[in-house]
Amino acid sequence: MSESSNSKVNPGGVLAGKVAVVTGASRGIGDAIARRFAMEGAKVVVSARTVDSGEHYLPGTINETVAAIRAAGGEALGVKADLASAADREQLIAAAEAEYGGVDILVNNAAITYFIPVEDFPEKRFRLMTDVQVWAPFELAQRVLPSMQERGSGWILNISSHAAIHPEKTLSGRGGTVYGMCKAALERFTTGLAQETYENGIGVNVISPGLVATPGVMHHKLINSENEDRVTPVEHMAEACLRLCHGDSKALTGRIDYADEVMREFDLQAAELI
């Protein structure tokens, strides 16, 4: 699929005037989503734990994402938030509302993951994973829903994984049970919330990326000769996310999709990111 040459902010784009909160937006998929939404005119609240370089072993920071958006003529606000913290979850939405008003789009992308077999999984890490991957999306949705319902419009997009699908019993591999459990819970939450908010003009969806060459994936050497032909460009993920955050919410809500499926269904071309 060819890439578009347009990489600048369009103030009259499909998200013009909308306020989007993107968690886990300092690198990888979250960074790409934040940039793509800004290109369509959204005011983007860029949230993550890493503010400056050197704070994390992986490259990418809030400041870098915000700077890239502003350099291209877009609007962005950086908000440091550890989503395992109740105070930070509250402060994130409060900061977005104080700066821009009500939130129109919430993208729950942040995650923390440990691959440990069930019998060895420490309670502290279990609670940390479920706090960030299940409770945080739930609470953030609770916090943005009142203003969305008042306006009669809004979008909530949850980033999942193929791990939500039940594994083959005959395949070897241990340690992914808790991660898969979290993503399965997130998907069931999504379809339930989509049903609850259907009449309120709010679209609630899930997108799973497949295998994307993010800094984390590259650091852990998860791409090899056996799967390199199945890598999804991060631009495709951002484009698919954009498509499920605008338009007729009743026609688009309650979806559980892979990025490439959305690209094919809507015949999308991935834009070059700012």
Feature annotation, model-predicted:
Residues 2-100, 114, 124-125:
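Short-chain dehydrogenase/reductase
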Residues 37, 102-104, 187, 194-212, ...:
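Conserved Rossmann-fold SDR core element
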Residues 58-63, 90, 111-127, 168-175, ...:
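Conserved mid-core segment of classical short-chain dehydrogenase/reductases
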Residues 112, 119-139, 153, 157, ...:
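Catalytic Tyr-X3-Lys loop
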Residues 132-150, 194-195:
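Amphipathic alpha-helical dimer-interface segment in Rossmann-like NAD(P)H-dependent oxidoreductases
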Residues 136-141, 155, 165, 186, ...:
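Conserved internal alpha-helix within the Rossmann fold of NAD(P)-dependent oxidoreductases
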Residues 157-199, 211-212:
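Catalytic loop of short-chain dehydrogenase/reductase
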Residues 199, 206, 225-274:
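C-terminal helical subdomain
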